[in-house]
UniProtKB/Swiss-Prot annotation:
InterPro entries: aa-tRNA-synth_I_cd-bd, aa-tRNA-synth_I_codon-bd_sub2, aa-tRNA-synth_I_CS, aa_tRNA-synth_I_cd-bd_sf, Glu-tRNA-ligase_bac/mito, Glu-tRNA-synth_I_codon-bd_sub1, Glu/Gln-tRNA-synth, Glu/Gln-tRNA-synth_Ib_cat-dom. Its main location: cytoplasm. One of its GO terms (cellular component) is cytosol. Monomer. ATP binds at residue 246. Its EC number is 6.1.1.17. This is Glutamate--tRNA ligase 2. Signal peptide: none annotated. GO terms for molecular function: ATP binding; glutamate-tRNA ligase activity; tRNA binding; zinc ion binding. Belongs to the class-I aminoacyl-tRNA synthetase family. Glutamate--tRNA ligase type 1 subfamily. It is found in: Cytoplasm.
Length: 479
């Protein structure tokens, strides 16, 4: 096999969404698996809708996911002369022609087709204009489009690596436009010229592009160019099997980033949207994907987007992430919540992260779970208050805890646990009668990391103050 060359060609008219990210990833994995090249091309010929901001977001999203490119970004808007050159070649060879039909004429054709129960197609009115007619129209200042002369008989077959052979009857295509009247190429024409000039060997893209493929093959054939191999990956659908949209929650890479998902988790999850490793495992790193990725193992069936599964995978990565790396990525979320400023104790934060990460699913969750280490506890969980602060002996138990904790030295998770266990025996109560109200008093919550981990991280003074504050709260509540 010659060198594999694939491309990802986003339009900078919006965000990098989960479907686009998966297309980029599958191309990248295929290139890396085969020791080939991954090219980033920008389909920005729609100048009105293309924005720099959108392009910046797409590039940042790819970098964040770890999808690096070997060539590019190559902008179509900077290659307009190339498209004109190839269009002129087709005109010269009689494989394309100028069309001067007005909007009104085209509308009339559409209405006539509708009347006759035919699909609306261009009738080929300008297909056989004489050289003199063309010159006269041009002299009048009419701006033509250029149409491809599509064979009116036969079939065009897409040999698809994932879907097998897909046949299209040429009679279903009209002589479609390849260059618009403003001298800009159409999507299909620019795509073919680019794929040829960039030496693309495999076109891996979403199933929604399958209907474009026969038109692109017809252009390749008219130009006498070698046709690349095609692979159309299935759509990513919402859980109700409808088209994925904003109403189904976050769908862009930037939104996932802002909501505290890790790039490794996103990459792991979107790889599963249509592909699975040989051993069937659902958690795997990118090196395994590169080693095993083949198009033959990509599913034909639609992939169902499941945010709960993504969140479960993200939780796995949070629990197993390198602690320093996790601390680094949590810090911006702590700043966003004003828990810390620019001046902070990195080692202290790292210790807290190490104890809270076991239960959390996103970086936002991790930051939220750290709140009571940086802010005062001013309210307590209602269900905890009802369950633990209303018990008859709770004030006496907590008062005894304060007295006992004042004597603990050094104050760490081992000494506090030993002290509390002795106190339980001394008071002849269950451990829950002491542990649960203490947790609620010092954190405001009924759940979280180990109680004695929390005590150690809060320190002696804050732990005691918070228990005293809770005693005060309970006594006022009882009045």
């Amino acid at each position: 096999m010659s060198e594999v060359r694939v491309r990802f060609a986003p339009s900078p008219t919006g965000s990098l969404h989960i479907g686009g990210a998966r297309t980029a990833l599958f191309n990248w994995l295929f290139a890396r698996h085969n020791g080939g090249k991954f090219i980033l091309r920008v389909d920005d010929t729609d100048l009105q809708r293309s924005t720099e901001e959108s392009m910046k977001g797409i590039l940042e999203g790819l970098k964040w996911l770890g999808i690096d490119w070997d060539e590019g970004p190559i902008y179509q808007s900077q290659r307009l002369e190339e498209y004109r050159k190839f269009a002129n070649k087709l005109l010269k060879e009689g494989k394309a022609y100028y069309c001067f039909c007005t909007k009104e004429e085209l509308e009339e054709m559409r209405k006539q087709a509708e009347k006759e129960g035919r699909p609306p197609m261009y009738t080929g009115k300008c297909r056989n204009l004489t050289k003199e007619q063309i010159e006269e129209y041009l002299r009048q200042g009419k701006k033509p489009v250029i149409r491809l002369k599509v064979p009116q008989q036969g079939k065009t077959v897409v040999h698809d690596i994932i879907r097998g052979d897909v046949e299209f009857d040429n009679s279903t295509f009209d002589d479609f436009i390849i260059m618009k009247s403003d001298n800009m190429p159409t999507y299909n024409f620019a795509t073919v010229v680019d794929d040829y000039q960039m030496g693309i060997t495999h076109v891996i893209r979403a199933e929604e592009h399958l209907s474009n493929t026969p038109k692109q093959i017809l252009i390749f054939e008219a130009l006498g160019l070698e046709i690349p191999q095609f692979a159309h990956v299935s759509m990513v659908l919402a859980p109700d099997r409808s088209k994925l949209s904003k109403r189904h929650g976050a769908t862009s890479v930037q939104e996932f980033r802002d909501q505290g998902y890790l790039p490794e988790a996103i990459v792991n999850y979107i790889t599963l949207l249509g592909w699975i490793p040989k051993d069937g495992e659902e958690i795997f790193d990118v090196s395994k994907s590169i080693k095993e990725f083949t198009l033959e193992r990509v599913s034909k069936n639609p992939a169902i987007y499941d945010v709960q599964k993504l969140t479960w995978i993200n939780g796995h990565y949070i629990r197993n992430y390198d602690l320093d790396k996790l601390t680094e990525v949590v810090i911006p979320f702590l700043k966003a919540k004003n828990f810390i400023g620019e001046d902070f104790d990195y080692d202290y934060i790292k210790k807290i992260v190490s104890v809270v990460r076991e239960r959390e699913k996103t970086l936002v969750d991790v930051a939220d779970a750290m709140s009571y280490y940086f802010t005062e506890v001013n309210e307590y969980e209602e269900k905890g208050v009802k369950k633990y602060f209303t018990k008859e002996k709770v004030v006496d138990i907590l008062k005894k805890a304060v007295v006992t904790l004042k004597e603990v030295e050094p104050f760490n998770k081992f000494t506090t646990e030993e002290t509390y266990r002795k106190l339980v025996e001394e008071l002849q109560i269950s451990s829950g009668e002491l542990f649960h109200p203490t947790r609620l008093a010092i954190s405001g919550r009924t759940f979280g990391p180990g109680l004695f981990d929390i005590m150690e991280l809060l320190g002696k003074e804050r732990t005691i103050k918070r228990i005293e504050k809770a005693i005060d709260f309970i006594q006022k509540m009882r009045k």
